[in-house]
Amino acid sequence: MALIPTVAAFPLQRAFIPLLEALTAGLPRQFPALIHSIYLYGSVARGEALPGVSDLDITLLLNKPADSEALQRLEAWRQAFQLEQRIVSKVDFDIGSV
């Protein structure tokens, strides 16, 4: 049996809250049938991110495996979102399905 370790809850840094609100509102609105859940990890999740320096690490779980068209649409959304958000150096999506 494999165990997934859990980590302590860290408070989000105030500077990153608008970014996370935009992401968690925008992705499900744009992809309502596709997005199952959104997970944050890395320095932003730990409360150690540096504005303008740190990247945003996101795991997306989809309701089903994405076809090439869905992956292209997710990538286009990620690129546009990254250009709009100056507080992080880049936005990374790791994508899986349930």
Give the positions of each predicted feature.
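Conserved catalytic core of two-metal-ion nucleotidyltransferases
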Residues: 72-98
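Active-site nucleotide-donor binding segment shared across nucleotidyl transfer reactions
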Residues: 24-56, 61-71
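Short amphipathic alpha-helical segments
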Residues: 15-19, 66-73
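Helical scaffold of the NTase/Pol beta-like nucleotidyltransferase catalytic core
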Residues: 1-39
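Alpha-helix initiation/capping motif
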Residues: 10-13, 67, 97
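Extended aliphatic helical segments
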Residues: 7, 44, 53, 88-91, ...
